[in-house]
């Protein structure tokens, strides 16, 4: 639940080659914002760095947002530290239909993760969405499109890619935005030699939204 911290320090790195970790039933890791250092421009580096490392290991894993809720009553306040998963579903499932569609979306990487103040309702690269596989031909340049909605003015977005060894970041300046806005990002990417790609965007208060990886062949 809390990779690389507390009693999970050193994990899942330690068992990355074990069959149970490589199984498609092992989803990946969970993100609660700890440590939370607001002097940094982005939250979640502990878990997002793990997401990038797992992607470079060749493991198709994902990160879900979570929060510890031991008790809920009228005094409970968990909005400020509850990261939210927004699933790509055709319709909201009914209780009597069970959890199958929710679990499938999580397992397929068909969701984005938000701290709450920034949303990414649409994210495609070459027409493919997170969790899907894009076959990159020649030339290896493809178009990224992403819809962003936000509360506070935005600071930047980053296209994060990996080649199986290194992680690369390409920053998109969003400092000219105002509060309560929306924008469609469009950018042509050179994905030569890359094996995965994802997008994240952050506002001036370190609130952010993170796509799950899109896999490249």
Predicted regions mapped to residue ranges:
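Catalytic cores of extracellular degradative/oxidative enzymes
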Residues: 1-61, 74
């Amino acid at each position: 639940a809390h990779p690389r911290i507390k009693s999970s320090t050193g994990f899942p790195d330690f068992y990355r080659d074990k069959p149970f970790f490589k199984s498609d039933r092992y989803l990946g890791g969970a993100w609660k914002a700890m440590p939370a250092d607001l002097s940094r421009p982005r939250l979640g580096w502990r878990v997002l760095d793990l997401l990038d490392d797992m992607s470079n290991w060749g493991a198709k894993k994902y990160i879900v947002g979570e929060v510890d809720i031991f008790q809920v009553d009228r005094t409970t306040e968990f909005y400020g530290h509850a990261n939210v998963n927004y699933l790509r579903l055709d319709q909201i499932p009914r209780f009597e239909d069970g959890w199958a569609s929710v679990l499938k979306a999580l397992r397929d990487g068909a969701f984005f993760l938000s701290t709450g103040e920034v949303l990414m309702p649409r994210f495609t690269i070459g027409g493919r969405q997170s969790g899907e596989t894009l076959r990159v031909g020649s030339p290896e340049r493809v178009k990224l499109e992403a819809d962003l909605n936000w509360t506070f003015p935005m600071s930047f977005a980053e296209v994060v890619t990996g080649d199986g060894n290194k992680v690369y970041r390409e920053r998109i300046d969003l400092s000219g935005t105002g509060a309560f806005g929306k924008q469609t990002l469009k950018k042509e990417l050179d994905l030569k030699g890359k094996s995965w790609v994802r997008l994240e965007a952050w506002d001036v208060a370190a609130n952010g939204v993170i796509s799950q990886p899109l896999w490249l062949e």
